[in-house]
Amino acid sequence: MAQQSRSRSNNNNDLLIPQAASAIEQMKLEIASEFGVQLGAETTSRANGSVGGEITKRLVRLAQQNMGGQFH
């Protein structure tokens, strides 16, 4: 039981800032549209993953811009 509890606490899918949920969802929908991906259970992991990967790239780019590029 302790292992199961510890696994839940390490879930990386939880947003650190819950208020960002709608912005992340909007970004996901925009990227899916750009890529021509129809999100859903019937969509392949590769297609869904491409959207997630692009979200990550864009969030990293935004963070770097907000930091003034100090970590290049």
Curated annotation (Swiss-Prot):
The keyword DNA-binding applies. The record marks 30-31 as: Cleavage. Keywords: DNA-binding, Sporulation. The keyword Protein transport does not apply. GO terms for biological process: DNA topological change; sporulation resulting in formation of a cellular spore. One of its GO terms (molecular function) is double-stranded DNA binding. Pfam families: SASP. SASP are degraded in the first minutes of spore germination and provide amino acids for both new protein synthesis and metabolism. Belongs to the alpha/beta-type SASP family. SASP are bound to spore DNA. They are double-stranded DNA-binding proteins that cause DNA to change to an a-like conformation. They protect the DNA backbone from chemical and enzymatic cleavage and are thus involved in dormant spore's high resistance to UV light. This is Small, acid-soluble spore protein C. The gene is sspC.
